[in-house]
Amino acid sequence: MEAGGGRIHAIWLPSENLKLDFTIGYDYNDEGGYPYYYTGAIDGYDKENEKYKNYIGKISYDQDCTYRRGLFNTGLNIEYQAQKFILSAVTGFQNLNDRMFMDQDFLPVSIYTIEQKQRLNTISEEITFKSKNNKRWQWVTGVSGFYQW
């Protein structure tokens, strides 16, 4: 298995009441196959005449099985503190690039294989408006949403 990744987190305070909090990260995974094995035909089938009887309980692939994933995340949190309230906006983005290839018949002959690929992008936004904590009555309101493609 090959894996790696990293993350950077930075905070900038351009003024006493404004904070910008930025995060970026990437993770990569490249794995080999999974140790599945052939269990024989389904119940009710004549197991004595099983065509692949010698492979029952054995790991016997004819193709390499792999799983690879790249995951990129980034986000920005902007927080403004006024005298009586706090305004916060959080924006996030994620990119997933994923591929799985499996020999699904679990035999040394080519009967059934599967390849699954995913490429997914997601952007999200959350805006909140809330009272300061030093008041007897506290309130919060906001809106959030996301979009995937």
Model features per residue range: what roles?
Residues 1, 33-39, 100-108:
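Outer-membrane beta-barrel translocator domains and adjoining extracellular loop/strand segments
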Residues 1-34, 72-76, 121, 125, ...:
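Transmembrane beta-barrel wall of Gram-negative outer-membrane proteins
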Residues 26-30, 82, 93-97, 145-149:
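Transmembrane beta-strands of outer-membrane beta-barrel pores
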Residues 19, 24-69, 110, 114-118, ...:
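Flexible loop and strand-edge segments within Gram-negative outer membrane beta-barrel domains
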